[in-house]
């Protein structure tokens, strides 16, 4: 053994060839600060070996290196800029020394080589991969850019266009694509990986392969003519501006850095990467996006822990076909859980099957599946007008009309047709689960399972625990949601549960603004372009359905009369009374016409202004700041109340439900992350300016208390230790 650290070791493999093996405790290798330091020490040992002829890097895990240790990021990002810059210089010196070894080097890459793992293998001369490879640089998705030389080496290896596509979009690619663009030199079966890598090394050692020529371009300026450079970088900047926009500074910073570094050799190019990385690491966007990643891991880990002792349902059923039922049936079947889809009429069943077939055909068109797979999946969805097969199902989700009487009748009837241990769930969006449970003989086997539309796209499923729902019931439904590829978040019961309970105060803020003379077009523009929502409130209401929102608004008002009962006729009432239900009938705040792809496209409709004039004061202008404050304060206040009342368990789960269920702008990180970034005291000052608008604007006492003590909702993160400590951590 030449060297042994906590996460890697170095040993002789055969005559003159050494192997450096990443083998961290636990299931995966991460390129954390300790591993970077250990890698530096191992390379120091290699530099002393006079009889070294070649080096092979490999992993003892199912994946090579999954990336940097993102759990370290928030504390690293708090390190002063100068210290963070110094540590990056140290880390890059490690990869430079790997790249500068006086012998050929190869990385035998299996599974994932992402982020820092990718940057590590870019420093070797050759890369041999297994067919399950996923390699790339996802840093821009975390609000940063490559910091270990990825933005320098990749463009010089692949050419600017391929590298820009991966780096700016935060993409990873599979083995075939990696081979095609030159990111790896070959692909072999896993059992032949090490032998194949050794064979390439021997060829390089013997002079059959010119490893020095392979290495040289990475040390030099990017080989691009002025015209080629102008075209590549202009197109890349245009694409980034269009897709990422102003709220995500990392992609455009990465492109501009690669452009600026193109005319320099490795050392100066790395300095430019360092100078760009450090300011990005100190942005609110980076903290928010890293926070989302960590919250996602937390939520999925919680679901895994919750389901460790239960069997995942093997057979499911959906009550109520149509678009929603068909979407749920498709998602279950697509992920390998056969499903019975029941409705009381043929038309709805046809609609449900058509929806599932349409989604499968899209997969076929994209080349994700073949005809055989399509037929196989669709054959596991069994449409029925009766209860045939219900005696074999493990879980049933009810997705009928949003009416408590209808839902109770359907659930009570179904309970008599299934096994005593079968779990029943309701896909209600607002009706309290404990109320629906009153119709059942076995309420402990019942809970809520709130999917979001469109089911195949929206990652969140709210799992609602009723007063009598058993732990086993919740665990089974969480297991099914996870199997469907969804992110399940368990919430406690109340009208609207979590997501709709906090959404409708947001809509109430919108209605009040319209009542006071604001233009819905400006509100939408501000909330989309300035705050960052994917849709403004008017457009969102049109998509949800004005009739649906009108009904839900009444349910919420009955559930929370003190805050959500209104004493005036609002815009939603006016549009509902005029039969303007949104996209579903082509008229809402906008008029909708189908484009060439059959998708609804919004157009101006002057008639809506006359309708709104009946429920609004004369038009007046509002500042962007006031619009954002009046829209967001009711939502954030309600989010805080949900945490205080135990409806949602943690700030992390609340923020993920908002991001995955409502499209809360990821660069804000969710309501609690936004609140922490703003500061509770500053938020309180802002909210107090609007408390005259009514109970929705009254800040909860718990939040006032946070403001008094200047406390955040997320645990306080301490800056990482000094750079000197990081080197030897």
Swiss-Prot record:
GO terms for biological process: fatty acid beta-oxidation. It comes from the Bacteria. In the N-terminal section; belongs to the enoyl-CoA hydratase/isomerase family. In the C-terminal section; belongs to the 3-hydroxyacyl-CoA dehydrogenase family. Residues 311-729 are annotated as: 3-hydroxyacyl-CoA dehydrogenase. It catalyses: a (3S)-3-hydroxyacyl-CoA + NAD(+) = a 3-oxoacyl-CoA + NADH + H(+); a (3S)-3-hydroxyacyl-CoA = a (2E)-enoyl-CoA + H2O; a 4-saturated-(3S)-3-hydroxyacyl-CoA = a (3E)-enoyl-CoA + H2O; (3S)-3-hydroxybutanoyl-CoA = (3R)-3-hydroxybutanoyl-CoA. Keywords: Fatty acid metabolism, Isomerase, Lipid degradation, Lipid metabolism, Lyase, Multifunctional enzyme, NAD, Oxidoreductase. CDD domains: crotonase-like. NAD(+) binds at residues 324, 343, 400-402, 407, 429, 453. The active site is at residue 450. This is Fatty acid oxidation complex subunit alpha. HAMAP family: FadB. The record marks 119, 139 as: Important for catalytic activity. The lineage of its organism: Bacteria, Pseudomonadati, Pseudomonadota, Gammaproteobacteria, Enterobacterales. GO terms for cellular component: fatty acid beta-oxidation multienzyme complex. Involved in the aerobic and anaerobic degradation of long-chain fatty acids via beta-oxidation cycle. Catalyzes the formation of 3-oxoacyl-CoA from enoyl-CoA via L-3-hydroxyacyl-CoA. It can also use D-3-hydroxyacyl-CoA and cis-3-enoyl-CoA as substrate. PANTHER family: TRIFUNCTIONAL ENZYME SUBUNIT ALPHA (PTHR43612), TRIFUNCTIONAL ENZYME SUBUNIT ALPHA, MITOCHONDRIAL (PTHR43612:SF3). The keyword ATP-binding does not apply.
């Amino acid at each position: 053994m030449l060297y042994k650290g906590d996460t890697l070791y170095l040993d002789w493999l055969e005559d003159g060839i050494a192997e450096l093996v990443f083998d961290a405790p636990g299931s995966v290798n991460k390129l954390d600060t300790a591993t970077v330091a250990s890698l530096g020490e191992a390379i120091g040992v290699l530099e002393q070996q006079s009889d070294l002829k070649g080096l092979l890097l490999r992993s003892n895990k199912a994946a090579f290196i999954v990336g940097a240790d993102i759990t370290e990021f928030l504390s690293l990002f708090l390190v002063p800029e100068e210290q963070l810059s110094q540590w990056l210089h140290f880390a890059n010196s490690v990869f430079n020394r790997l790249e500068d070894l006086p012998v050929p080097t190869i990385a035998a890459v299996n599974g994932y080589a992402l982020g820092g793992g990718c940057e590590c293998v870019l420093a070797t001369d050759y890369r041999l991969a297994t067919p399950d490879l996923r390699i790339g640089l996802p840093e821009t998705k975390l609000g940063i850019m490559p910091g270990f030389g990825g933005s320098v080496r990749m463009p010089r290896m692949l050419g600017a266009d391929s590298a820009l596509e991966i780096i700016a979009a935060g993409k990873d690619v599979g083995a075939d694509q990696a081979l095609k663009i030159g990111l790896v030199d070959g692909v072999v079966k896993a059992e032949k990986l090490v032998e194949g890598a050794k064979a390439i090394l021997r060829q390089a050692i013997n002079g059959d392969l010119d490893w020095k020529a392979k290495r040289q371009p990475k040390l030099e300026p990017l080989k691009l003519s002025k015209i080629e450079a102008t075209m590549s970088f202009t197109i890349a900047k245009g694409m980034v501006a269009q897709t990422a926009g102003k709220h995500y500074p990392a992609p455009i910073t990465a492109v501009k850095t690669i452009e600026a570094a193109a005319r320099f050799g490795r050392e100066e190019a790395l300095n430019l990467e360092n100078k760009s990385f450090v300011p990005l690491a100190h942005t609110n966007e980076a903290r928010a996006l890293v926070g989302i990643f960590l919250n996602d891991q937390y939520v999925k880990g919680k679901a895994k822990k919750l389901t460790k002792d239960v069997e995942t349902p093997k057979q499911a059923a959906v009550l109520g076909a149509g678009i929603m039922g068909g979407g749920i049936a498709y998602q279950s079947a697509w992920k390998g859980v056969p499903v019975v889809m029941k409705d009381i009429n043929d038309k709805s069943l046809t609609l449900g099957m058509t929806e599932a077939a349409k989604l499968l055909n899209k997969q076929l068109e994209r080349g994700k599946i073949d005809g055989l797979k399509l037929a196989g999946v669709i054959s596991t969805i069994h449409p029925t007008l009766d209860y045939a097969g219900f005696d074999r199902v493990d879980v049933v989700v009810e997705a009928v009309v949003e009416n408590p009487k209808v839902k109770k009748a359907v659930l009570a009837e179904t309970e008599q047709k299934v096994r005593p241990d079968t779990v029943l769930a309701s896909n209600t969006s607002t009706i309290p689960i404990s109320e629906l449970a009153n119709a059942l003989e076995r309420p402990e086997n019942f809970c809520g399972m709130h999917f979001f539309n469109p089911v195949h796209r929206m990652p969140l499923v709210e799992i609602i625990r009723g007063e009598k729902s058993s732990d086993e019931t919740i665990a089974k439904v969480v297991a099914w949601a996870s199997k469907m590829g969804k992110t399940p978040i368990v919430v406690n019961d109340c009208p609207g549960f979590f997501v709709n309970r906090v959404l409708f105060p947001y809509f109430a803020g919108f209605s009040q603004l319209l009542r006071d003379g604001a233009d819905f077009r400006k509100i939408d523009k501000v909330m989309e372009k300035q705050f960052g929502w994917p849709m403004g409130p008017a457009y969102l209401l049109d998509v949800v359905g004005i009739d649906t929102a009108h009904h839900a608004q009444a349910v919420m008002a009955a559930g929370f009369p003190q805050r959500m009962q209104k004493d005036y006729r609002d815009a939603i009432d006016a549009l509902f009374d005029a039969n303007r239900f949104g996209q579903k009938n082509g008229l809402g705040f906008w008029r909708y016409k189908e484009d060439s792809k059959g998708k609804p496209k919004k157009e101006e409709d002057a008639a809506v202004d006359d309708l709104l004039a009946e429920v609004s004061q004369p038009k007046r202008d509002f500042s962007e700041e006031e619009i954002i404050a009046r829209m967001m304060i009711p939502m954030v206040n309600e989010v805080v109340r949900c945490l205080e009342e135990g409806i949602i368990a943690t700030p992390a789960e609340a923020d993920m439900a908002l991001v995955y269920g409502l499209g809360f702008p990821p660069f804000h990180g969710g309501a609690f992350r936004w609140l922490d970034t703003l500061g509770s005291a500053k938020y309180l000052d802002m909210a107090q300016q609007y408390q005259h608008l009514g109970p929705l604007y009254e800040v909860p006492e718990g939040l006032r208390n946070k403001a008094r003590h200047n406390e955040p909702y997320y645990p306080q993160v301490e800056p990482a230790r000094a750079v000197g400590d990081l080197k030897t951590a």
